[in-house]
């Protein structure tokens, strides 16, 4: 998982400007920073906030079977992830501007409140639709919490201590997104899937109280010109038209994908209408962004840069592959191998460990050499190979195979997932770093939203088709309505074998989508600049000096 660095980079730029203005006075720059116990409490609160927000990205991956057991909502699996990614991506840029134009402390607490409200709705959801609404609200809050953690750290922590502080937040982001499936599995098996959401309430409440008591918005976090801007200008900066067009377009596509071939035929008026709506809102979004210029969520001027253009294309496919893998591998373990939700999360450890190791290696390599494209292309090629190996999984796959193939995939992901953002940041103008980071994050997260839904549609259609073929007398809708944990209780013998094989064939289609996505991401990476970013920067400096 890559770290949403939009506001952290913006803050770093502000730090650089402040350092110049104060002629290198470093910590003694006249600004107010926290220290002692207040700083310790703030660090604890921000770590907890970050951990809760990023765990929510993947915690439902292993909780899904228990959710489907209760709601009999196999067709909604794609929504539980996609709607969360959709709102995180769409609101990321808006939160960055909210922190810029309004009081930092109050807006961070507002983000926490929205995040907690969404989790209350999820935990108490009486229906699958209510859970989906809760996930959407939670995503909006999570985007603000993640961005806010880095922003608060940048303004509240003394410059000499800031690298270690933000490094702790970054490490928390990586760990949290990786352990989400494990925590989701443990809570679902031992307590209830609802505690995947309720657990956020006491911990998040404690963190919010600590922030309220021990943190106040530093004076230097307020840019008076921004805060004095008219309400009209502040609202224009939020790019609400772009936000709503984006949400509408994605919602239309998700509805079409989740309806098509399962609850409605592909040629039904509802499916066709939502597809038409997707294209119309996408076109409208493009027009709005073009007209909005520098106020846009996706700034057209920045998108024209080669590293950004192909970074977003590759990032979209890579984000899709990443989240399809995270969400559908646990289904393989539970439906095909019959493991519990907890065990399916633990069986993801080879992937988690592999990706953690090579993410560190990739970052170190790029910092030392400046070369990023070889990692993107090489890692992408290795990821495609590992996806092909995962495609070969079956009900008789050995332990060594599922461990080895996942470990290989994790090693590959770590090499190629983060570098496009690092490269785009390194080559962007200082004033464009934040916007560039936000654009790449937007497309990576949207890739997850789209492709998890596409994989769900492919999986459901494949399951239905094969079940009719393997076991004509089985009630297809009854199987779909049966949760994964109930399959081996409700069905036995040859009928159960047919159902498991049908699940396997459906999963293979989802795994094939991962192969296509990783391959497309690798091809996009080929068109990234092959020079070291240090060389490119030096060439730009020479041009500017001339």
From Swiss-Prot:
What GO cellular component entries does it have? plasma membrane
Its induction note reads: The expression of the dibenzodioxocinones biosynthesis cluster is positively regulated by the transcription factor dibT.
Q: Which domain of life is it from?
A: Eukaryota
Q: Which CDD domains match?
A: MFS_Azr1_MDR_like (cd17502)
Its keywords, alphabetically, are: Cell membrane, Glycoprotein, Membrane, Transmembrane, Transmembrane helix, Transport
Where is this chain primarily localised? Answer: membrane
> Which PANTHER family does this entry report, sorted A to Z?
MAJOR FACILITATOR SUPERFAMILY, MAJOR FACILITATOR SUPERFAMILY (MFS) PROFILE DOMAIN-CONTAINING PROTEIN-RELATED
Name the chain's protein: MFS-type transporter GME11371
